[in-house]
Structures are given as C-alpha cells and as structure tokens.
C-alpha cells in the first residue's frame, strides 16, 4: 500500500490517500478528507487503472477526468497526490515528498 497525506494549503483541509495494487493494472483507492468536494470524489474514485491514469495526456487521465466532475478548484493538489501514490504503488517512482513553497513579495 502507498500513502500520501496532503495539507492542501489555505483551505485548511487535510486529505489522506491510500492506493493498494489489486489485479493487473488496477488499484483500490481510499481517500479520507473533511473537504466536501474530495469526499464526493472519493465516492466515485474507488478503483483506478494505472495505465488509464498515468500514460495519457493530463486532460485524458482517468484521475483528472473523474476529478473534473467534483473539484472546482483547479489548483487543488489532491489529484496530483493520487497520481504520486499510484506511481509509488506500481513501482514507477520511489516514495519522495513533494514540496511547494509559496510566497508573495
């Protein structure tokens, strides 16, 4: 199982993502969050195919197609975090934290 904890930023929501490889190219996805949009997303995104998520243009990724139905904030980091968990779970990347430092001068 691969896990990602997302502190989304100014919204204050934390999302916990778990991806668990099942058969072939499929994985179970479990997302827990207090964000209503992420909760709605998690109700549909319970299983994904890594090929349909990782090897398509961003707009055609299974993750982003489902995300587009529920999340109205384009800069939400959760969809990217789901893909990062998928990468790690299927051995496409090593587990490594991603950091964004945002400043305004």
Per-segment meaning from a language model:
Residues 12, 25, 47, 51, ...:
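A generic structural micro-environment signature
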Residues 1-27:
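Short, charged/polar N-terminal "headpieces" of proteins
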Residues 2, 72-103:
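Short, compact, well-ordered microdomains
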Residues 22-80, 93-94:
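Active-site- and interface-proximal helix/loop "cap" or "latch" segments in soluble metabolic
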Residues 10, 33-35, 86:
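Glycine-rich beta-alpha junction loops
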Residues 17-19, 63, 99-102:
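Generic preference for hydrophobic/aromatic residues in regular secondary structure cores
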């Amino acid at each position: 199982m691969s896990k990602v904890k997302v502190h989304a930023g100014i919204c204050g929501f934390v999302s916990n993502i778990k991806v668990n490889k099942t058969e072939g190219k499929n994985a179970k996805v479990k997302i827990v969050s207090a964000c209503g949009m992420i909760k709605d997303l998690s109700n549909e995104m319970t299983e994904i195919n890594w090929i349909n998520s990782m090897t398509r243009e961003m707009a055609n990724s299974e993750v982003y197609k489902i995300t587009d139905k529920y999340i109205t904030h384009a800069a939400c980091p959760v969809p990217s975090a789901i893909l990062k968990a998928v990468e790690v779970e299927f051995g496409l990347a090593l587990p490594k934290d991603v950091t964004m430092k945002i400043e305004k001068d």
